[in-house]
Amino acid sequence: MRLLLHLSVLIGLLGAAPRPARAQQPLEVVILAASHYNGSLAATYQPIIKKLRAYQPDMVFGEYLTAADAQALPATNQYQQAHQRRVSYLRRRALTTDPLTSRAAAAANRQLRRQPQLVRPRIDLARYYTFANDRGNAEYQLYLLEEPLKKNLTAADQAYYTQAMGPVDSLRKVRLVRPLTEYHKIIFPLLTEMGQAQLYGMDCQRYDEPWNEAYGQAITQNNALKAAFLIDSSTAQADTYRRMVATRTAYFAYLNQSDDDVEVYRLLNSPAYEKIDEALNFFGGEALYGAPGFPTEAVQEMRRQWVLRNQGMCDNVVRQARQQGARRVLVAVGASHGQTMRLLLQKMPNVQVRTFNDLP
């Protein structure tokens, strides 16, 4: 599928922050189960943005870590290692001055609320957020500079931008500009249209290590099943492998029902998708537990770590929404998280959950 969005006009980022309120006021969460690959032309996804904008969320969350959670990760974590590569990249740029302090960044944001068309404060903020391990907001500022504000850059602005951040090709290589993501194509344009200056992170990576261990065990057993199948396809284990392969076939057959990107998003947010996605991600899922040769224990451990991660994501959403006094929020998340987060949020007190498909 292909998704793309481009805004020709920047709408001022003036949105007022929600005010703190009672901790247990009713909270509504809309989940957008999104594709991580979005490669179509700009106008294609305006209907999705229009639908989300009509909902008027007080806050928008993305599948990024908060700066505090990211900074707390061990140096061996993949997310932390990627951050260190981005910091090293910035330190090699021509601009060698220190990034903004948190106080100066707050002042830059206040200035941009008054004058959202300014360019240099955004360059400084993009650099600040990158150093601070707030990847989501670094990418948001870079989206604004590369898309709606690009025409505003003078030659001097462009020179400063290159000194601070490097050429856009290099920014793509370090994955700070990712033109095909749901953020660049849908969420950042949505925030821009709504005048909201911040994307809130909610990912949880505390369970990354045990997840990877369980996944590695499952992959090893899956590969052994495949090797045995190629030798003898008549065994009970071979039948298990065929059932595992069938889940992948069913997954792609479901998504290939339509070439229309808006329709694909509807498919991603449907109960039918939740069922086949669960099977794909867990090597066939619960239906294969106990089947000959199936990595039952490893997959069960994967599932346990997956639920823990998604519970952490839900906790992050609800905690921050309560802190900000928000009454309705949008959560954009990879489609595989949609069902698990929905079920977990439904168990949380005073939280109502809707999906993208539930919106008018």
Model-derived features: positions:
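Bacterial Sec-dependent N-terminal signal peptides
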Residues: 1-27
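Second-shell loop/turn segments in exported
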Residues: 35-39, 171-180, 301-305
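Extended, H/D-rich, highly charged conserved domains that either
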Residues: 152, 157-292
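A short acidic (Asp/Glu
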Residues: 41-43, 70-75, 210-214, 339-345
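A structural signal for short, well-ordered beta-strand segments and their strand-loop junctions
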Residues: 59-65, 196-204, 331-332
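Low-complexity, serine/threonine/proline-enriched polar segments
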Residues: 83-153, 233-282
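Internal alpha/beta domain cores that form substrate/cofactor-binding pockets in large enzymes
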Residues: 24-130
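A cross-kingdom marker for long, charged
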Residues: 31-33, 252-360
